[in-house]
Amino acid sequence: MAATNEVIPTSENPSDVSGSSQKLATEETALANGVDHEEEDSGEAGGEVFQLTVVLPREPHKIPIIVSSQEAIHDVRQSIIELPGTFQYSCFHLEHKGERINDFVQISEVPGLTADSEIHLVEDPYTEKEARIHIVRVRELIGAAGDRTDTLNGIISGVSLLDSVTSAESTQNGTSTAPSHPMVGFDFQASGTLSTLLPKAQEPGPKTIKSISVSPWNPPPYHLRQKGHLLYLQVTTNEGEQFQITSHVSGFYVNKSSTGKFDPSPKSAPKAHSAHSLLALLGDLSPSFEDSFKRLQEYNNTKEPLATFQITNATPSNPWIVPSASAPLVAHQADITRTQENYLIAGIENSETLRDWNEEFQSTRELPKETVQDRVFRERLTSKLFADYNDAAARGAILVARGEIAPLNPTEGKDAQIFVYNNVFFSFGADGVGTFASEGGDEAARAAVGKDVMGVRMVNQLDIDGLFTPGTVVVDYLGKRIVGQSIVPGIFKQRDPGENQIDYGAVDGKDIVASDEKFVSVFEKLSKALKVKKHAVWDKDGKRHDLEGSIETKGLLGTDGRKYVLDLYRVTPLDITWMEEVGTALDSPKEADVASESAYPHRMTVIRPELVEAYWKVKMREWVNGELERKRQAQKTIEPTAEEKEPGAVAEASEASKSDEPTENGELAKKADESDKDAEPSKPAADQERIDIGDFKFALNPDAFSGQQPQTDEEKAEFAEDEQQVRLVCEFLRKTVLPELVNDLKEGDVGFPMDGQSLSRLLHKRGINIRYLGQVATLADGKRLESLRILAVQEMVSRAFKHVAGNYLRYLPIPLTSSCIAHLLNCLLGTDLNATPKPDVDEAMAALYPDADLKFKEVSPESLKRDIEAQILRRFRYTLDSTWTAAIKHLQLLREVSLKLGIQLEMKPYHFTKQSQTEAAAAPPTTNGEATKDAAPTGKSTNGKKKKKNAREGSPASITSVNASSPVTFNPDDILNTVPVIKEASPRSSLAEEALEAGRISLLQDQKKLGQELLLESLSLHEQIYGILHPEVARVYNSLSMLYYQLDEKEAAMELARKAVIVSERTLGVDNAETLLNYLNLGLIAHASGETKLALTYIKHALDLWKVVYGPNHPDSITTINNAAVMLQHLKEYHDSRTWFEASLKICEEVYGKHSINAATLLFQLAQALALDQDSKSAVNRMRESYNIFLTELGAEDKNTKEAEKWLEQLTQNAVSIAKHAKDVQARRNRAGIRVSPRVTLGQTQLQPQVGQTAEAAAGRDSRSSRGLDSRSIDELLKFIEGSDQANKNKKRPGRSNPKRRGGAAAAAGK
């Protein structure tokens, strides 16, 4: 919880929300525990904020602390522990007027405790646990704690680069030879630099003591335990003195022991030292301690706090490129206490870490959720619990994969073995016992457990009373898929003869069907939410059973009396169109098994829930419109205006409302706040227009096409109808959803994916399964969609490689996996350097494993190529070109493969071609700092942070293999680590999302004050529920920073954007697509706040990331480069600005063609830039080109055409005038020295939408209000050049159309 105290935009928050601003300001020192701004509670009870004084036993004797009446005393304690003036206290209680205050009551419940009251901090006697916690804490505070032994998270997990990026800018500014701006010499076409992904080397912090550890005399003998001895410590100060310290119930004191003699009694005066806090005792023992501790705090204060907090509620991101093992950042240091930390944290019995996960999950779910307070507490607990469980399950899964845990059934085959560790039940995601024999065996089992996690997450999100799910995690590690589940009470119970193991759904395959009535009510609620139809199934005897859910979805009545739902891999129907196409829709399982090699690997091809939701919305809209039309016909008397108003409202409500569910009485009611205002004047009309959506019926049968045998004609007819309904949804996917997505990307209407992960997320959001990547690649036809085709092919290749590599890695002993991975990577990516790579296997190591399957040694580039092509044909129905290996982007494919397999590679120059290796060999040693396959671009000087390290490590072994005559790209030593890839089922916070949505709606309705209060409330809820370091919090920081940017709250926007960057770096990855977009938005906001050089630094870093993630010339980089050009104009760097506009235009012409509307828009801007650069002739030519395109594409009457024509005339007339005025510019600029206000930009920067988001949505605008070209006249341009436009700086200018909306949008703007 420590992290949650450092929250947030303080005084920079909007002044008109004083209460919320004050609340946020105070959260630096106090964690607001669920302050409730809802109207249902009284304003005062909503969380009154006031100041208390804490009286301390020693200096500074008193400290003020800001608290909220809703806070628990426990949170106040935590705040005191975190404050710099009081962090030596950890074992204490609080008293008010001599009465001890219970830690678990709220401040408002303490009698007589009001503003300016005094509470006393009273030190408690230590217990052994408190003493251990105190010691761990002091070690961390004084910088004596090394890195913890971590078996789960990889090298530099959770790293942030923002400090490095920002410091690069400030260092450059501080030098006399600093370039005039960060973009000097930037090379647009250079390949990516791996060092972009690593932080700069930092100076180590000052040392406060040499060492502190548990003494060899620990633990105390029995007779001394009786006297209050808890632990013995050993401390060596910076002065070199060694002290033996006793941890006693009364505190800490120096004892008489030495390394050879045991005497834990206190030393006598003058050497006697004792204190309640170990921190205070260390200050007494070491003369230099106070000074070095102060310097350490100053050193820590230079770092961004968010970058140093421990990540507790999310999985830290694991970078795929990491420093070499000997780099200072990760060098292994001797630390005796590293091995003792588990004991210090968990105690001698280690029992404190064992938890009953299932009971915790279910009892948390049973917590009340009536009030907002209840919901905050419940969701906060849920979030932490899922994070803890995911962590424990992933750690256990790695131990299972490494063979460290004994199976419960050692006589069974490997894939059928099950394990229990740390109260988590583990099994392999393979078909060990033949359950999926007819569905595709191991492949089907692997797919099923992945789908199961998704199903469990959906059920967790729905939060249905009385229905419980086990904790579920799937871990992929070195080719193995391992499922970790919390142990459901009764799942292992031996049932009596004739009694089923399962109470609802299929038992033992589908031969027996159980349908216990107790499950009907909860499964009915689940099915309604998931659009699942109640339907008949038949057992092996042909007996009919009516089930609420799929036959595969099972209900189990636990011995704890709770109803559990299991096996949620089939909550949606099978994709029959796909199955018929790929040969898996065969009636006979045996036929399917012996189907050709090209058949899809399994029959678990279900449609996505997002597709069902999208289809439901379409059907609902059709039905609503039909009903309205019917009512109109029936009620001719109602005024036409009232009639025409309603359909939009209903259709919008059905689309915009997140939970398109009917209200209690089954009516599609408007949101309360809207209906209060809107529905009041015309209640009778509204009542007549209201439609009862309870009459709308839509549900799908998930067991359609799954081999059910209806018995009667009536049953057959109904089943045929169910199957037809499923077919329509499958057709909707192919005929509507896929083409729409491709068209949106073609028109530039939405943010473009930049890597496999963002492409997958976009497909999933639209309800498209990954198996349709082949169709996406086929539909991505033409120059405009070339980027999409390249991405889709790259993603298919990386996924196929993952499957091929998994087959070789699955049963390979761990010490041989690096050789396997390196060889497979050489066969995939290193063939230009060495066409016949040989595996580098340590034969002595291999000899230790005589049974190991070393078939990877036989893999050649040709065989791997064939395997990948076959996998892509089977899984994606796509045939690669014969030249695909020549077309792959080496660096980007290496990144995709590493992320999918969890590989962490050493940061060094990887040579993919002979040319790059020759260049590197010929280069002087000093250039060894840049980790790319090409020479470093000139603009990359700031990234040479690894120079020293690489120069030191530039041995031939780091580039070539053992056999120097045949160099290879990758060696086994380059694979420093592999980390697990985790799929988990934690739900999102519905409460925090509701507040965010309500805030957005209020802003759209122009209720600015209410909107901002709700947004702040949502921010507070996100932080309380998730903790600060969580991907959802990064997303809300980013959304709010954009909204504040729109509201002109620049400081608050800047603070939130910085936090968004750090949190997404640490939880999603330093090169994740969301992180990159967060950097771009931070750049925009920094520019708007007047820090244009810093903004360009952020944008340069984002472009450097882009080169690694995608390569040059990404369609969305048109906007980014354009924004950078506008910023350079602000810095009066007119010539450089012009080259950036030209670069943007070049990419635009490549992607959209020379005669596209987007090209015309950019030509228009470039002409202005050329005019500023005093190149009047080129300016006139470019404006003429722009005018001609607008004229051809939009016609003479279009406002864009007219605008361009006006500019063209004036540019031609005033060419002479510009030349004349240009002479005065420098003198005037030097005299004035005024920074141009961002409001009077000639060009305007554009917001960067998230992948799949429209530009309008990113800007918080209505899509209907697209903007036209810059309407300023040439005279204003002249004034701008001369710096005389300052007088008008408060006058808002209409913006130019957004080049981000490539194509259709610009056209729309002009119509």
From Swiss-Prot:
TPR repeats lie at residues 1034-1067, 1076-1109, 1118-1151. One of its GO terms (molecular function) is mRNA binding. Residues 1289-1303 have a biased composition (Basic residues). GO terms for biological process: intracellular distribution of mitochondria; mitochondrion organization. Its main location: cytoplasm. The keyword Repeat applies. Residues 1-46, 629-691, 915-965, 1236-1311 are annotated as: Disordered. Disulfide bonds: none annotated. CDD domains: CLU-central (cd15466). Residues 7-24, 915-930, 1242-1253 have a biased composition (Polar residues). The keyword Metal-binding does not apply. Residues 335-579 form the Clu domain. Keywords: Cytoplasm, Repeat, TPR repeat. Signal peptide: none annotated. PANTHER family: CLUSTERED MITOCHONDRIA PROTEIN HOMOLOG, EUKARYOTIC TRANSLATION INITIATION FACTOR 3 SUBUNIT EIF-3. mRNA-binding protein involved in proper cytoplasmic distribution of mitochondria. May associate with the eukaryotic translation initiation factor 3 (eIF-3) complex. Belongs to the CLU family. This is Clustered mitochondria protein homolog. The gene is clu1.
